[in-house]
């Protein structure tokens, strides 16, 4: 991995800003770009039943992205747009019964624009309050527990860097991941994201889910709200 400029990336990757208004005067905007994303699905014809779950563009409106809706057509017996339970992640779900052709086309219109956040002059307020909607990004997960070796590693990283504020700690963790982790082409799929397993075996090689979760887990263990956020190149 190559070291990148954390100051340019911190506002747009996995850290969750506590108060977006704090960054209002530091966010640079550019023109909007429109895209139509079309997925054409043709499933195997054999079998009595077929199910499809298709991830869709994030429907949460932000200052850099929003969706104008999705439509579908095809021969599915049942189909619907909905969010994965307990999340804001939208998916398209379709069902076919009986053998035969199973086709569906799903289109989404998305508007995006480039963004950057200049943190050089960022001033962090004391006694910050974390909104309830953000607190879930401080919770442990099955593959990213926040105790044991994960917490010990996070603590050693921030202490070695003499990092005290959340921004300083995030910067230190980011640099540590860049310096110590690497992409492993032999990992299956996008990786498992099991950072406890990675740290216990001192093997920090992996793919996107592994490396992203490593940063997110260490950040959460340091009291910094963070989440995994994946996207599609357009």
Regions found by a protein language model. Give the residues of each.
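Solvent-exposed beta-strand/loop surfaces of large extracellular or lumenal domains
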Residues: 61-94
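N-terminal export signals
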Residues: 5-24
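Acidic low-complexity segments
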Residues: 82-84, 103-184, 188-202
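Short, hydrophobic/aromatic-enriched beta-strand segments in well-ordered soluble domains
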Residues: 37-41, 52-54, 102-114
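Surface-exposed beta-strand/loop patches in extracellular or lumenal glycoproteins
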Residues: 44-60
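Hydrophobic/aromatic-rich core segments of domains that either
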Residues: 211-234
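C-terminal segment of N-terminal export signals and the immediately downstream linker at the start
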Residues: 20-42, 47
């Amino acid at each position: 991995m190559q070291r990148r400029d954390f100051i340019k990336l911190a506002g747009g990757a996995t850290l969750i800003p506590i108060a977006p208004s704090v960054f209002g005067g530091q966010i640079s905007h550019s023109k909007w770009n429109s895209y139509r994303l079309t997925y054409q699905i043709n499933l195997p014809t054999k079998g009595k039943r077929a199910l499809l779950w298709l991830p869709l563009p994030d429907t949460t409106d932000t200052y850099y992205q929003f969706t104008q809706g999705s439509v579908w057509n095809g021969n599915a017996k049942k189909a619907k747009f909905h969010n994965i339970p307990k999340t804001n992640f939208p998916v398209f779900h379709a069902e076919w019964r009986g053998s035969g052709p199973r086709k569906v086309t799903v289109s989404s219109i998305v508007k995006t624009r480039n963004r950057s956040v200049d943190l050089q002059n960022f001033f962090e307020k004391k006694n910050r309050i974390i909104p309830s909607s953000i607190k879930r990004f401080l919770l442990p997960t099955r593959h990213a527990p926040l105790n044991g070796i994960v917490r010990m590693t996070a603590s050693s990283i921030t202490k070695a860097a003499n990092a005290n504020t959340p921004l300083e700690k995030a910067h230190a963790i980011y640099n540590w991941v860049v310096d110590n982790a690497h992409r492993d082409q032999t990992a299956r799929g996008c990786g498992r994201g099991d950072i406890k397993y990675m740290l216990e075996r001192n093997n920090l090689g992996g793919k996107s889910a592994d490396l992203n979760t490593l940063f997110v887990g260490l950040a959460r263990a340091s009291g910094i709200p963070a989440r995994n956020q994946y996207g599609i190149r357009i």
